[in-house]
């Protein structure tokens, strides 16, 4: 149990690194350094809210593998660790590459519309797939961006493989609840770790320990639009756009 939760936290760190890397690219491409230097007082709040938005993504991604980890731990079978490892490799490979792709699309959308992904994003799909492919082929640096995406995807797959091949965690003594030599002290320690882990996931999914959960108003950290645009990530903005599209569809019908 302990080592499987540790693997999940390591994979979560990879997601945070991906989102942080995209933020750096966004800042370099769209935010003047003078603007950042002139608003240093808002940086602590900006970074804190950036972490909240990114941790929400991390914790939602954690939900499925966490549930499977607890279910498999209850089975107490020798093959569960092997199955979980294979699942994590496939799951996080798909999720991380999707996050990278959505973040890249969001950067391209911002460069054209000076906004993160919004309701307008879905208009591209109304023209049909061939028109969309033609527009991308003619208006974007497909070769450079495709090569960059391929290289980053290969790097992500390599990191995932390295995480799952880390055997130092497998030697953790008597970590499993199924171990016959689990002492009372170790059981208390493991129970505490599990409770803290669950609290971390729940709070992260909510994005807040205060009265209101994380919401779009938390992106407003200054009176500068570009600094505010640094706060949300592509996944949150896509979710917001999907909600707006659903509301618009209800109004039309």
What positions do the PLM features span?
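Membrane-anchoring hydrophobic segments
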Residues: 1-100
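Membrane-interfacial, low-structure loops and terminal tails that flank and connect transmembrane helices
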Residues: 1-6, 77-87, 164-187
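Loop-to-transmembrane boundary segments
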Residues: 5-9, 83-94, 137-149, 183-188
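A conserved hydrophobic secondary-structure block that centers on an alpha-helix together
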Residues: 130-132, 140-171, 175, 183-188
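Membrane-interfacial interhelical loops
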Residues: 22-53, 91-148, 169-170, 206-235
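Internal/C-terminal transmembrane anchor helices
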Residues: 180-208
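Membrane/wall-proximal cationic-aromatic binding patches
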Residues: 231-253
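Alpha-helical transmembrane segments
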Residues: 64-75, 152-167, 201
